[in-house]
Every structure is written in structure tokens, then in C-alpha cells.
Swiss-Prot record:
Residue numbers spanned by region Membrane association: 171-172
Gene giving rise to this polypeptide: vif
Region (SOCS box-like): 151-180
Protein name listed in UniProt: Virion infectivity factor
Modified residues (Phosphothreonine): 96, 188
Major location category of this protein: host cell
Site (Cleavage in virion (by viral protease)): 150-151
Membrane topology term: Peripheral membrane protein
Family indicated by similarity: Belongs to the primate lentivirus group Vif protein family.
Amino acid sequence: MENRWQVMIVWQVDRMRIRTWHSLVKHHMYVSKKAKNWFYRHHYESRHPKVSSEVHIPLGDARLVVRTYWGLQTGEKDWHLGHGVSIEWRQKRYSTQLDPDLADQLIHLYYFDCFSESAIRQAILGHIVSPRCDYQAGHNKVGSLQYLALTALIAPKKTRPPLPSVRKLTEDRWNKPQQTKGHRGSHTMNGH
């Protein structure tokens, strides 16, 4: 019998991102209880030697599986030390690969609070609108007009620790330009 190959999309990430992801998932599963019904599978529970963990997130009758890997072929950059993440959506016998943005949106559909449809009417009537979105990563780029109006009205509260975001897990933080907060230039060069 000949070998059959399967190709999977694996996002290269650094080891510390994976540790942060594990920590956030476990915190919200066991401490805050916001990720109820999620299932965490350790590396020793997997039959594949390169799988370091799996997080199963139920989405109705389907589920999202975020699988982390170790011992992969290193990438072209020095920090790609053989760690990666795959994101898979499964329903019965069907499965497909997802990108991190879509995974975060699917998680947002089933978990974590957001504005209700009646919130804008309550805001117009002058009532206090208390529901806020806890899961900012689930909103893709620019939100709807309703969402933008409500975020202008109520600043979202900071959740400590933050909720686990698949997009944040797979984000490439080295190839982004560095941003310095609050510095307009050198004080000695400006003469101040």
C-alpha cells in the first residue's frame, strides 16, 4: 500500500504565544467559567507525537479544534522554532481548515456577551446600556453601524486576563513595524 499525504494549514507561532494561549484557555475554562463546555486535550492524550495540545470548542452540533504542534520543521526566520497551530471546523464526518479571523467570529457567535438588538433603542431613550462585548477579537475589522454607535457610547471594559483569541495566537508580531507609545522624538534633538 502506498503512502497517502494530507496537507494541512499550520500557522507558525512562537512557543510563548502557545503558552499564553494555554494559560488563557485554562483560566476561562476553570476559573472564570466563560469557556464552559470547552475541552482541553494534553499532549500525552494524543496519538500523534507532534501534537502538543488540542482545544475542542463546541459550536452547536459542530466543533472547532485548535491544535498546537511542536517539533515541526523550522521556518526561514530564527524565531520559527518548529511550533505551529492548526484550526479545524468539524461537523460529523466533515471537516475543513479555518483562518484565525473566521475562528474568532465563530467563537463569538456561540460564546461571550455582546450588545443586544434592543440596546440601541434603550440608548436613544436615555436608558443605561450595560451589556458590552467581552470578546473584541470576534469582531472583524470595522463593525456594523450599530456596534460602532454603541462602542462610542460605552467604552468596552478590559477583561483581565483577556479572552483567548485564535487571531492573537497566530499573529506575526515580528514582521510588524515597531510602534512606540507617547514619544514624538528625541528631546535633545528637539531642543526641549
